[in-house]
Regions:
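Ribonuclease/tRNase effector modules and their secretory precursors
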Residues: 1-111
Length: 111
């Protein structure tokens, strides 16, 4: 089950470097779009079921300001200055994923 992001989620920012910037932008998703999806109230987040043991990873699905449905994989990182979100990969969603997202958002709004 995917859960909506709550506005109470606090983090100090994003962690970007050459390693994740290129991988995230490889599918044409801009950094600003990724950051918006990870902070938007209608983004749904779930633990990554395919992640091997180790660093926790999460899947986020949501919409950019322009309305593009976007899929983001990220990990939270604890730093001295506070928690940061490190995007790992991002791409625009396929039609089937969009339908699933819309169903989950409707279900969350009914609660």
């Amino acid at each position: 089950m995917l859960e909506p992001v709550t506005r109470k989620t606090a983090f100090a920012g994003f962690e970007w470097d050459a390693g994740n910037r290129g991988k995230c932008q490889k599918h044409g998703v801009a950094i600003q779009e990724i950051e918006h999806v990870l902070t938007h109230a209608e983004t749904l987040i779930t633990p990554d079921p395919k992640n091997p043991a180790g660093e926790p990873r999460f899947l986020a699905i949501g919409r950019t300001r322009q309305g593009r449905y976007t899929f983001v994989v990220f990990t939270p990182r604890q730093r001295a200055a506070g928690a940061r979100l490190r995007p790992i990969s991002a791409r625009y969603m396929h039609k089937r994923e969009i339908r699933k997202y819309e169903q989950e958002i409707a279900r969350a709004q009914e609660r």
